[in-house]
């Protein structure tokens, strides 16, 4: 009857294990519990990131042929990479298809570490991630055709410019010529993409514009236990945010809205995302599919009204490629902030992040914001914690009497249980009275876990002294050691289980958890350390001042 703390530790441990196993399966890695098909190793792309590189996507499967964006064919003409630079991007546009083939996000470090650049789009021998467009509905220009840069000149955003425009013209195919224009704006992670379709033939044409993101299933390199969802996502007013697992695309079992006149499609990874955002109110079809052993795409197909000879049509869209900063995403498109995925705890996690952000706005340091948020949460839950610790204090007081009863009736379990129940009744103690207050707090605990895990704001954010990046593990393992010590102290304050096996398990738990926490992001471990220290202080105070009672003889 005295195993409630053991039960809670087991629940906590199993929750952590299941979270990790869920991450394993989300990223195409073998589950620890459920068998899965072996993932195919990423196929090497044939392009390189130098001049003349092309966007090779492999042959599309037969199922994707009808009405789908074309697969990449063998190059018929030499393509080039046009480099560009803005205050937030360094990138390359491949003239084959006018494809956005490389995009590096620039973020300045704090001077104590390298600048926090990350390459989002890329096309190398080991990794493919592209944003491309083209036309369907006839032998029209698509991403396999070599475009020509119009008005070659400055490709960098200078100090007195707010926008940078780069235009590319396709060859004439099927009586159609396409001019694709990228517009980069200072300080913005939203790229304007304008597709101008000129009918230079002698008959009307009715093309369809496709806009897609192509990516392999290679996991992003981040610290252990720091991964979230990786894969395509679709947002519509009808179904809101729908994640699509690569494994579902492998089996052709993906479930998502395939037609809408609103929303967006995206590729999501830890901390960063890209999304095609067509104009609202314009009908489009949505598709997501596997096009190579390790290559996938998600996109939209938007029909264009008939274009008479000598006339033209414009299709405008926006391409987001940047960090998953919640407030910024909310201002770009409805629902785009959902790419920062908190899973089933979103309803609790979003208010927690809002509060964390407000505290950061005051103190200006994410580490101290975590500390203050933890203190605030502990204050809110103090009545529940007090009830739990009072119950544990009472149990600790009567533990000697319980042990005496167990020893006296060890040969008669029924009499022993009856005597224990009578003792609980006499002393007005509920052996599980400390469990419910703790269980109620578990959703908040898990929600804050995901807040700290999913927030790109932690990336490169320093705290004090040796902690220069709250999204990375503690380089000297000081916080995990403090975590282990605090867990040991907290365990020692609890009633000692009468069962020797349970007692050993309680002593082993801090060691087991500390090993796991050695690989957690420093911001997450900081929360646990502060939470444990506050819990120890609360428990000590309540045990000594509020929950203390005089021992009675057995």
Curated annotation (Swiss-Prot):
Q: What are the subcellular locations of this protein? A: Cell inner membrane
Q: Does the keyword Acetylation apply?
A: no
Q: List the membrane topology term(s).
A: Multi-pass membrane protein
Q: Which InterPro entries match?
A: Membr_insert_YidC (IPR019998), Membr_insert_YidC_N (IPR028053), YidC/ALB3/OXA1/COX18 (IPR001708), YidC/Oxa/ALB_C (IPR028055), YidC_ALB_C (IPR047196), YidC_periplasmic_sf (IPR038221)
One of the record's GO molecular function terms: membrane insertase activity
What protein family does this chain belong to?
A: Belongs to the OXA1/ALB3/YidC family. Type 1 subfamily.
NCBIfam families, alphabetically?
PRK01318.1-3, yidC_nterm, yidC_oxa1_cterm
Protein name listed in UniProt: Membrane protein insertase YidC
Q: What is the species listed in this Swiss-Prot or TrEMBL entry?
A: Burkholderia vietnamiensis (strain G4 / LMG 22486) (Burkholderia cepacia (strain R1808))
